Design a protein with these regions (language model features):
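A structure-centric signal for secondary-structure junctions around beta-strands
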Residues: 16, 118, 210-212
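Extracellular/periplasmic Venus flytrap/periplasmic-binding protein
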Residues: 1-94, 130-138
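Conserved beta-strand scaffold positions in the cores of enzyme catalytic domains, especially
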Residues: 47-51, 121-123, 215
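Segments of small-molecule ligand-sensing domains
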Residues: 146-158, 168-224
Length: 226
């Protein structure tokens, strides 16, 4: 919800009116659509939407249907494959439609799949930039290097690394090692934990860890610009 609100606040603040949501035709997809509807209804606005089947290819007919909705901006909640295909097909028609995607899209996967068509798309990020000058970024970069990974660290790597560090800390605090319920209780009682310049917080009613959200734009060089 925080990611969707960040994207919608940006675009509605820029004066764009017709929001079109791209979502999966399943429970999670419908929840994403409902979040957008709820946010925009408070401004007296109503989004339009197009639903996709999971693991199905995006065809030209669906792009036709999407463009008939005359979007000012696309809010994407599907994975990198279909999102990239939509970007490529819109671009191949000589059109440009602003798009913002949930972090769920997988930034690096989208960038690779979309190619030049991905330039200008903004993607929500739930961790700091992979080039930020903070301890957790340096620590995770070293872990990847020590593991033999030669590619530059990206946001997906960093998010996984932070998750692993949080899980390791919870395991360290578990009173009964190897006990799933004990690990769950340790996570629930973790409280505020500084991973190294990036603080997460867990509790009985706090299970997301962080509300950090930034929008990063894909550059022409295929990099995320914060």
């Amino acid at each position: 919800t925080e990611e969707l609100e960040k994207m919608l606040a940006f675009w509605t603040g820029a004066g764009l009116k017709q929001v079109v949501v791209i979502h999966y035709d399943d429970e999670v997809g419908k929840q994403n659509l409902a979040s957008v509807v709820d946010y925009l209804s408070k401004q007296g606005k109503q989004p339009k939407a197009i639903s996709l089947q999971r693991n199905a290819k995006v065809d030209a007919k669906q792009i036709d249907e999407l463009l008939k909705l005359k979007p000012d901006v696309l809010i994407n909640t599907v994975l990198s494959g279909p999102a990239a295909e939509i970007s490529r097909q819109i671009s191949s028609r000589g059109l440009t439609v602003p798009m913002s995607s949930l972090s769920f899209v997988g930034a690096q996967q989208y960038i690779v799949a979309a190619g030049e068509s991905g330039a200008g798309v903004s993607i929500a990020q739930v961790v700091p930039s992979a080039t930020a000058q903070i301890p957790i970024v340096r620590e995770c970069a070293k872990v990847l290097q020590d593991a033999g990974v030669t590619a530059p660290m990206n946001s997906t790597h960093l998010e996984a690394c932070i998750g692993a560090k949080v899980l390791t800390e919870a395991m360290r605090r578990t009173k009964k090692p190897g006990n799933p319920e004990g690990l769950l209780n340790a996570m629930r009682n973790l409280g505020s934990y500084d991973t190294g310049g990036f603080i997460v917080s867990y509790g009985a009613t706090k299970q997301h860890g962080s509300k950090f959200v930034e929008l990063a734009m894909v550059s022409r060089e295929g990099r995320l610009r914060y």
